[in-house]
Amino acid sequence: MTPERDLLVVREKFGVGGREPTLKLPGGALLAGEHLGQAVEREVLEETGVKAVFESIACFRQWHGYRYGKSDIYFVGKLRPLSKEITMQTAEIQECLWMPVDDFIGSDAISNFNKQIVRAALESDGIVQSFIEGFGGPESREYFMPKHLIDGSGVVPFPTDFSQS
C-alpha cells in the first residue's frame, strides 16, 4: 500500500469454482526453498511489475481439505512499493490497478475475506521477519514475531546479506 492509501489489486483471467474473477490482492505459491518475504516480493513483481519491499505478515489463514486432502496456509504480506508503475502479466491477469483502500473495503464486488485481510493490514503492524540465534541458519529458517521482541537478546532482525541455496 502506498502512503496515499492506494492498494495494488489484480483481477485474474480465470475465476475459481466457475465464479467470475473479482479484484483481489496479487499472490501465488512459494518456490521450493524460498523465504516468505522473498516470495511475496517476487509474486507481486511477476503479476504487476511493481517492485516492493516486504515489511511484515498482516495475517494468515489455514484451510483444511484444500487440495489432495491437504491443508493450505495463505499469508498476507504488507509491502512498501518502490514505484507505482504497473507492467501487468497478461498470461494470468486481466486487470491490475492502484485502488483507494476505502473504495476496496467499501465495494460490494469485493469478497468479505479480501476486505478483512486488508483491514488486518491497515490496523496492525503485523509480525516481522526475524531470526532466533542458535537455531539453524537464516538460509533454512525464518521466524515471524512482533517487532518489539526483536531486541538483540537472542531474537535479531532477519539478515539480508546471506546466500540462499
What are these regions (language model features)?
Residues 16-22, 32, 90-165:
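Nudix hydrolase/Nudix homology domain
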